[in-house]
Every structure is written in structure tokens, then in C-alpha cells.
Amino acid sequence: RGGGIYVENGGVFTLKSGKISGNQAFMEPKSGIFATDVDSYAKGGGVYVEAGGVFNMFGGEVSKNATRSFFKNWSTGNDRIYHAYSEGGGIYLEGSQEETVNGATVTVPGAVFNMTGGKIAENATYAQGGTSASSKSRVTHANGAGIYVGTGAVCNIKGADSDSASTNIEMMKSFPQIVNNSCGGQIVKASYTTNSAIEVKGGGIYNDGTVNVKNALIASNDFSEARQSDAKTAVHIMRDEYLPEGQRTITYSDGKTATLP
């Protein structure tokens, strides 16, 4: 969790300029015949904000970060449930949590992200499921390549109002930008698996909390890929476009390209 920056409960992180770039959160459980009910999580490739933490972004970039979650090479044995979660390639906002303090249960509010400028771009989430026989259920989740907003977390993206003389291009350049982020998922060698699925959701923002947007550019976050190796695997893609096997790179109208890890 938090390949570049980790903000704890009660912490405040402010970004005014510069880059958080080229980081990754990576998880790959090792092979094991006796392992059961195993999940693999990778969250917050660039920035992970705990419940109770705050991230203020006034400028700069969170770019080219990634979360990668894998499970593979599990041998035959008892029925198992395997899930690979890859969430928040750029930024992960943890949802509200319950903690016990002096015997009492206390609710910690979800993380808060305030963005008034800067760019979240070319981040990626990628999840892959590998060899597994006799599994009852297996799902790969690749969600929120730009920003993942957990339950109870709050994401405020609000650019300044432009004067009436500004052109559309000038206004867009001044707005906070969430662009060219990508999600991808894959299950391979799953011929014995039932009830398998790939979920790819929210190339720009995955919202399970509260998102407030005003004067922002959220565009070209529709690059995603999902692959499967047998007819028993279901593919679910929401608000993204499907790219067939072998087509891992897309070229946008401005000449820029994005490629899955």
C-alpha cells in the first residue's frame, strides 16, 4: 500500500508542485498447495491515504504509478476462493473504519482528497489470476486507475472559475486534470475454474464514497483490457472500452499513447 506516499490517520499531505511518479504497489502471493481462501491486494500505487488522513493537491502531478496484484500457480486441492484486487493506481482513499479505543468502538471517517489543480495521469491498475484447479470462485478486480474512493471517503475536485474572456482551451489547461489512466485484468489457464470473473471499473475514478466535481477535465480514461482463457470466465467492464487480446496500446487523437503494464 502506498508505493510513493502513505498518509496515516490524522496526517495531512500537501502537494503544490513536482511529481509523484514511477511508483508501484505490488502483491503476489507465492505458490502453495495448502493455502486456502487467499486474497491478493495492491492499493495506492502513487499515494495511499488512510481513513482520517487528508491529501491536498494544489498543483504538480501524480503520474505513471501503478498497482499490480497477482495470484498464480496454486495446486489442486480443496475448494478455494481467490480474489486479486488492484485499486487506486494513482491515489487510493481508504473508506471509514471502526476502531476499538478503551473498549469502545470509534468510527474513523474516510480519507479526504481535495484537488484544485495539477494532473493525475497515465496511472494504471492491473490484476491477474493464474493457474488454479477446482476453485469455487475467482475474481480479478482492477478498479480506479486514477483515483479509488472507498466507502465513506470524500473526493473534492474543484478548479477555479475562469473569467468570461478565457477560451475553452485556456480554461481546460487551468482545470484539475484526470486523464489517460488505464485499468486491465486477466485470468489465464482457468479451464477447471467455475464462477470466474474479471471486473474492470472506473478508468479515471472509481467511486464508492462521495465525489464532488466542478471545473475539471476528466477524459481519455477509457483504455482497458480484459482477457480470458476459457468460456467459463465472465468479463465485466464498466465505463471503459474493451480491447481484444494482443491490442495492449491505444493511440489518442493528440498522438499520445497508453500501454498496459
Predicted feature residues:
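Surface-exposed loop/turn motifs in large extracellular/passenger domains
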Residues: 1-261
